């Protein structure tokens, strides 16, 4: 959205798909395999694209999918528990992510200094800048105000102050927009144009997306699939909740099972009522997955119900 406001042709590669020059390719992997990726890059160049915003997964780094690519800027948001079914430990997961910032692969790292791993990456990156809300950094925000409709804050962007308005709520969106603004400023985009671009973004599909109202209740859909992601979403909504906060979720099958009870605990702590249901069980029994989540919920509350069929669960939750 910032590139668009600046009149710059930009491509986008990530979990939501591949987008450029009015083209859209449905996602298969967060980071495509190298052969397909380079084919997309070539077509982007032919289509007049000059910049690419790309999500690079830890799996892609582990398998060397982006070994031949040199990045102008690499943003580090945070390191939280995920993919331990593959990496085994947080140390190995962090080591995979760290590959993006080491050596000549990344010309400049843009690091979240409120995250311990983000601060540590400053020692391995050849050049880095920082953003934060709680620790000293190059870019930070003050006077943050949030509601269901979005948030606004004053950004200090390398000592240049400007009001930023977002159509998305949540402190995590403040962090993400600061990182985007910092990159855009380094590229040379004027701060008023950066603010215009951020304000023009109506929503990000499935990212704390406001789905509408039902019987006076505001309904949000979020991609949260980790304990940290679920907690951030519930914390973002809680201050603006006029009544009860109901959380409906499940966990994917054949993926990190350790996070299932942890996510149950998060929902029990931060929501008033939890609806446990199925979410892409793959080759596992959906009920077995839900029972693993339930172990975490039961530690803190009895305010929950299991409705394995997702459609029925959604109907129950909105009526609740």
Where are the regions a protein language model picked out?
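Acidic, Mg2+-coordinating active-site environments of NTP-dependent enzymes
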Residues: 47, 71-219, 242, 294-304
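Short, ordered loop/turn segments at secondary-structure junctions
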Residues: 15-16, 58, 79, 133, ...
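Short beta-strand-centered segment that lines the nucleotide-binding/catalytic pocket of NTP-utilizing
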Residues: 6-20, 56-57, 249
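Structural beta-sheet core signal
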Residues: 12, 54, 74, 111, ...
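Switch II (G3) loop of P-loop NTPases
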Residues: 49-59, 218-225
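Conserved helix/coil segment N-terminal to the catalytic DExD/H
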Residues: 59-67
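Conserved nucleotide-sensing/catalytic segment adjacent to the nucleotide-binding pocket
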Residues: 24-57
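ATP-dependent carboxylate-amine ligase
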Residues: 159, 179-206, 210-320
């Amino acid at each position: 959205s910032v590139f668009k406001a600046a009149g710059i042709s930009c491509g986008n590669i990530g979990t939501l798909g591949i987008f450029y020059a009015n083209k859209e390719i449905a996602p298969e992997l967060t980071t495509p395999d190298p052969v397909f990726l380079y084919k997309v890059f070539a077509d982007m160049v032919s289509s007049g694209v000059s910049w690419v915003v790309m999500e690079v997964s830890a799996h892609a780094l582990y398998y060397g999918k982006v070994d031949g690519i040199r990045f102008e800027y690499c943003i580090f948001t945070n390191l939280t528990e995920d993919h331990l079914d593959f990496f085994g430990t947080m140390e190995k997961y962090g080591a995979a992510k760290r590959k993006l910032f080491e050596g000549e692969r990344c010309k400049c790292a843009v690091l979240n200094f409120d995250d311990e791993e983000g601060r540590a990456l400053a020692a391995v990156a050849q050049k880095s800048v920082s953003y934060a809300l709680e620790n000293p950094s190059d870019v930070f925000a003050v006077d943050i105000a949030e509601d269901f409709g979005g948030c606004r804050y004053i950004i200090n962007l390398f000592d240049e102050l400007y009001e930023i308005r977002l159509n998305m709520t949540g402190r995590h969106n403040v962090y993400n927009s600061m990182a985007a603004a910092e990159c855009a400023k380094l590229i040379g985009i004027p701060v008023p144009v950066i603010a215009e671009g951020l304000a023009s973004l109506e929503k990000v599909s499935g990212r704390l997306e406001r789905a509408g109202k039902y019987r006076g209740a505001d309904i949000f859909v979020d991609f949260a699939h980790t304990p940290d992601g679920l907690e951030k979403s519930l914390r973002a909504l809680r201050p603006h909740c006029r009544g009860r906060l109901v959380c409906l979720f499940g966990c994917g099958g054949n993926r990190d099972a350790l996070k299932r009870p942890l996510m149950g605990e998060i929902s029990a702590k931060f929501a008033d009522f939890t609806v446990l249901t199925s979410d892409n069980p793959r080759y596992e029994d959906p009920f077995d997955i839900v029972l693993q989540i339930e172990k975490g919920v039961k530690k803190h509350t009895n305010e929950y119900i299991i409705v394995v069929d997702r459609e029925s669960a959604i109907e129950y939750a909105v009526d609740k």
